[in-house]
Amino acid sequence: RFIVFFNDKLYLMKYRRWIVRSCNLRGSLVSWQADQKKNGGDDKMKTALVTDGKYRSSIAAVRALHRAGYRVVVTQTRADVKSAPAVSVSKSCDDFRWIDGVCADADYAEKLLSVLKEYEHPVLFCVGAVTLNTVAARREEFAALANFLIAPKETLDVLNDKESVHQRALELGIPVPREYDGTPESYPVVVKPHCGEKFGLKAADRYAVANNEAEFDVIMEKMQRYDPSPIVQQKITGAGAGVSLLLGRESELLGALCHRRVREYPITGGPSTCCESFYDEKMIDEAYELLKSFHFTGLAMVEFKGDCILEVNPRVWGSFPMTEAAQSPIVAHYAQAAQGGQVTYTAKDYRTGVKMRFFLNDTVAALSYLKAGRVKEGLRGLGDFFTAKEALSAKGDGKVMRAYLKKSLFER
């Protein structure tokens, strides 16, 4: 024992100076890492800032950007939520930043600009429509501090107007539903305002279906509270689908992803609760032709029903998590192109046949189908619990789903 102790003592004495130097170096390394974290990372790791963390679509964007090698910062306006959003506990979220007030505040742009100044020209990824429009209205100011692909405010406004999209599609020879100026000649018809989002309507309230004249009169009276001349269109039968596109600064096509609706809630017509990825070259070509005609830049989803184009969402869309489920590189391509990097469009660069569901919403949808007597659809929905990918889940990042469920079920 004495020999061992003696040898250990000699060993420690011999390497004492080396140990001291190592400890000093370690202390310096810790300080350097802290400085790097404060300044947005080292030279090899660039920063991406994702806004509006309260939206579940932000989770997919954060994970994709982190995987692409970015240090991801998430922002959220404090008064718009009751507690920190689920994305804040994601392993892919390197930093979470509160912004005082709500995103509708007059000084929101200045607050967001102030946050951006703390980083070295980060990639800016806007999730919420209000933030997107805020940046679009002051593109030059934001472009001096961040990299992004966002169309001018005027372009976003035109694309948000369903009638403008309808007329442009007609000019391009792209199929659209028939419209009625007065009382419809036949039913059913769909009644919707020119831009439901502008009036603060939830997705499920942005249109209504009239099966006869009596229903039409009631719906028109309700819709005219928001829009004095709502759009009246023939109701198209067929599967609903979305073609999501990424366009560069010169409106060049950089990425595409198709998905079809499997279920929705309310089941009479509402947001998608389950969808499946697929590929359709014709639909992509038509969607791209439409967006290109507006000289669009950025991310958008063109909504189809059957062969007809219904509308355009010129922003991050509700089923955006499909980009992760189908392993689409569209988010990474957004960041790369925003920084001036070269991105070449590759057709079908994602997995097809991937089903994705939003657990809570889709469970309610499946039960609603059963209650309505549509047993096969209801049972199929319950069966997808075991086969479809959960939109917000990811291996090794389970805290996010648990936080989301807790907020959804218990936070009012």
Positions of the model-derived regions?
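ATP-binding N-terminal substructure of ATP-dependent carboxylate-amine bond-forming enzymes
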Residues: 2-19, 24, 40-149, 405, ...
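Serine residues within intrinsically disordered or low-complexity segments
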Residues: 22, 28-31
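Short, acidic/small-residue loops that bind anionic groups at enzyme active sites
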Residues: 145-159
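Active-site nucleotide/adenylate-binding loops and adjacent lid/helix of ATP-dependent enzymes
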Residues: 156-230, 237, 249-252, 281
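A short beta-strand motif that forms the metal-chelation/ATP-contact edge
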Residues: 190-192, 245, 306-316
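ATP-dependent carboxylate/phosphate-activation module, predominantly the ATP-grasp catalytic core
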Residues: 205, 211-214, 234-240, 244-295, ...
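A short glycine-rich, hydrophobically flanked beta-strand micro-motif that places a catalytic Asp/Glu
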Residues: 297-306
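Peripheral (often C-terminal) accessory segments that flank ATP-dependent C-N-forming ligase machineries
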Residues: 336-412
